[in-house]
């Protein structure tokens, strides 16, 4: 599997190349004029991050890469089986190559063509963070905030994709929540709950697929302890107040976020090598 990292992608998008791509699809001078004005706010190159249209433009800029990968996929197809698969959103790209020895040439060929396409678009590959991943050796790769790996199910002994939130994403969430508890340590607990609930809801809703249950349990327990410690300090009490404040009280009376349910996605089976 090819896991590519693009160096400062959003800051290096070439405006003239992007506008050429947009012009092939939109025949409206006013729209093109407004788009040029929007792009120039970020300087001579790059796409302004945070804008409503920025994800669309970032995806559009790399459509030639998608076309190349689609051609590779169809050229090497054998009936219903494909030996090249890929997934991309903006600058996050992973390419999976069939691991059978007879397809070993594909890895080098696709890797070479990818680099050629990125060079045409003047997009630089971050060699330090790009790598070839061997899923047969239980190695993992990251995509859109998740860690993916290939595991065999214990019940049916079938290979399946296993994906969980990346550790750095969990760490970033806890750091953000810690900051709320620190800055509002003298405030009533219901105020703290009002502030952390939207943060938890947004994060959990995004990661509520795959195999996030263990991660969610850790976060849920961590938040409960922080809430208990907050209330204990307000009353000059030590400990976490397990007897004073039941779990039911935290969720029913305080209305602490409790929607940690994981949606089971129907992930495709991973074919054996």
Residue ranges of model-derived segments:
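Conserved polymerase palm-domain catalytic core
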Residues: 1-135, 140
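Alpha-helix N-cap/helix-start motif at coil-to-helix transitions, marked by capping-box chemistry
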Residues: 29, 33, 60-63, 164-171, ...
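Amphipathic alpha-helical core segments of compact helical bundles
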Residues: 40, 58, 62-66, 197, ...
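Short, solvent-exposed helix-loop connector elements
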Residues: 45-49, 162, 178-192, 202-215, ...
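A glycine-rich phosphate-binding loop feature that marks nucleotide/adenosyl-phosphate handling sites
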Residues: 86-89, 128-138, 196-199, 216-224, ...
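A conserved non-catalytic segment of reverse transcriptases
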Residues: 121-188, 199
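Extended C-terminal regions of large enzymes
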Residues: 222-226, 231-273
């Amino acid at each position: 599997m090819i896991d590519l990292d693009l160096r400062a992608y959003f800051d290096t998008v070439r405006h003239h190349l992007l506008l050429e791509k947009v012009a092939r699809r939109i025949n409206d001078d006013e729209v093109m004029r407004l788009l040029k004005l929007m792009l120039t706010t970020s300087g001579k190159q790059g796409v302004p991050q945070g804008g409503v249209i920025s994800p669309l433009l970032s995806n559009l800029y790399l459509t030639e890469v998608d076309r190349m990968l689609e051609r590779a996929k169809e050229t090497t197809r054998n009936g219903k089986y494909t030996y090249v698969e890929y997934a991309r959103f903006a600058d996050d790209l992973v390419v999976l190559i069939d691991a059978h020895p007879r397809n070993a040439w594909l890895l080098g060929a696709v890797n070479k063509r990818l680099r050629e396409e990125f060079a045409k678009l003047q997009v630089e590959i971050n060699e330090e963070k790009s790598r070839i991943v061997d899923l047969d050796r239980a190695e993992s790769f990251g995509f859109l905030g998740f860690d993916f790996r290939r595991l065999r199910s214990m019940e049916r002994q079938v290979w399946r994709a296993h994906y969980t939130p990346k550790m750095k994403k969990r760490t970033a969430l806890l750091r953000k929540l810690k900051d709320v508890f620190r800055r509002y340590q003298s405030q009533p607990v219901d105020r703290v709950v009002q502030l952390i609930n939207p943060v938890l809801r947004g994060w959990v809703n995004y990661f509520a697929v795959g195999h996030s249950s263990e991660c969610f349990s850790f976060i849920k327990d961590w938040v409960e302890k922080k809430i208990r410690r907050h209330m204990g300090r307000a009353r000059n009490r030590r400990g976490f107040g397990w007897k004073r404040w039941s779990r039911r009280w935290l969720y029913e009376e305080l209305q602490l976020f409790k929607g940690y349910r994981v949606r089971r996605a129907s992930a495709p089976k991973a074919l054996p090598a």
